[in-house]
Amino acid sequence: MNKNENAEQPTIVKYVEGNYGGIQLMSLSRYALGYVVRGSKQIYYGDTHYTVSRGDVFYMGVGNHYVENLPDEGRPFEQIVVYYSPELLQRILLQLNMSYGMNITNTHHCERCRRLNHVAVAASPTLRSFFMHTASYLQDDNFMHDETAESIKMTELIYLIVSHEDDCLKSKVLSNVDSSHDNFEQIIHSNIFHDVSIEDLAAMCNRSLTSFKKEFKRHYFVPPHR
């Protein structure tokens, strides 16, 4: 991962590994969503390992991961990975709710979600199509340096995940919403998926309606909508 990347922007990367590199330590400072195009990936927890197969979408949390990328019968291992910060995820979820009226919820909880720092599921047709189209975009050098295009693709990816039925992948992604923001953002995020008026939100934040609207736009770059 590029250590100098802007943590406020997603980074979309295509990896092609022609040579087998064995088990490697991967240290993540941001969350990762990826898709295995060819080959398979092993993720290790001590003596236990989990397989991410071709056509699977995977999530990897912040921290250290021991991974092994396996080529496919002499053909290079290939994957597409999107890195994102919790702050960016929170802004995207807020945009989906405020601009498109999405009521984003999750009721899925399981032992594997709680215990493991990754999850892998078979990609739905829409997610598979998303990653394959993204692969074609990555062939254009201009896309790789276009932060707006990356943000649009990131929003699309999060939409496809959170609009899907509740599962491990959706649960893991939604668990990444940052809880360390100041009180203003905590109040907003705690209530954006409920039927709360702008006036009520302003009162909860101890702001006048005018001050609330100004501060909301400063935090989220869009005005609040009723």
Label every PLM stretch briefly.
Residues 6-106:
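N-terminal regulatory/effector-sensing and dimerization cores
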Residues 17, 165-172:
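Short, Lys/Arg-enriched N-terminal segment that forms or immediately precedes the first helix
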Residues 28-31, 152, 179:
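Aromatic- and histidine-enriched alpha-helix N-cap/loop-to-helix transition segments
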Residues 96-156, 160, 186:
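Amphipathic alpha-helical segments enriched in hydrophobic/aromatic residues interleaved with Lys/Arg
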Residues 147-151, 174, 205:
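Conserved phosphate/pyrophosphate-binding and hydrolysis machinery centered on Walker-type P-loop NTPases
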Residues 160-167, 187-191, 195-226:
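Basic/polar phosphate-binding segments, predominantly the helix-turn-helix DNA-binding elements
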Residues 176-177, 226:
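Short, basic, alpha-helical segments at the C-terminal edge of helix-turn-helix-like DNA-binding modules
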Residues 177-185:
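Short, leucine-enriched amphipathic alpha-helices that occur as contiguous helical runs
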